[in-house]
Regions:
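General beta-strand recognition
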Residues: 27, 50-52, 98, 125-127, ...
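Short aromatic-glycine motifs in intrinsically disordered, low-complexity regions
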Residues: 71-77, 126-133
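Cleaved targeting-peptide boundary
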Residues: 19-26
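Positively charged n-region of N-terminal signal peptides that target proteins for export
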Residues: 1-4
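Central antiparallel beta-sheet cores of small beta-barrel/beta-sandwich binding domains
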Residues: 30, 35-113
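Edge beta-strand at a domain terminus
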Residues: 123, 129-145
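Hydrophobic h-region of N-terminal signal peptides that target proteins for export
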Residues: 9-18
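C-terminal terminal-subdomain/extension
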Residues: 113-117, 123-125
Length: 145
């Protein structure tokens, strides 16, 4: 019985370590107002990370179902709700970082190179940086619990 318990605990620990810590639901925060803008669900497909908007938090006077009419790729004229805004993020070996992907701003249709990272000891704040050349903006997304 003792061996079975030890085996079960070891298996649980291995599975917990193997799970990608970035996966899950993250609240995006408006840089200017501090309000929650949306919830993005981060998933993994074929070893890459993707993020889809699964919930929007809009003020009563705002369009409740905005579309990306400024997008120029397959997201053109698609609703922001349900849109895949993060694509093709690749994990950095040995780090809590993902890079070489893109992020789309559905408000203006612009697509930016993207990198994301979790800081050791704080798995509930995801740093998301969109950039073009040397210009960048970093947001902190909060894990939805």
């Amino acid at each position: 019985m003792k061996h079975l318990l030890t085996f079960a605990l070891t298996l649980f620990a291995v599975v917990a370590i193997a799970q990608n810590p970035v996966l899950g639901k993250w609240k995006t925060i408006d840089d200017e107002t501090g309000r929650i803008k949306s919830v993005v669900e981060i998933t993994e497909r074929n070893g890459k990370i993707y993020g889809q908007v699964i919930e929007l938090f809009r003020l009563p006077d705002e369009d409740q179902n905005p579309i990306c009419d400024e997008c120029e790729d397959d997201r053109k004229d698609q609703p922001a709700l349900g849109m895949e805004i993060v694509r093709d993020m690749v994990p950095v070996a040995g780090a809590l970082e993902w890079e070489d992907g893109t992020i789309c701003d559905p408000k203006n249709g612009k697509i930016y190179d993207c990198e994301m990272w979790l800081e050791e000891g704080n798995m509930d704040e995801l740093k998301v940086r969109g950039y073009i050349f040397f210009l960048f903006r970093t947001q902190t997304w909060l894990r939805q619990k």
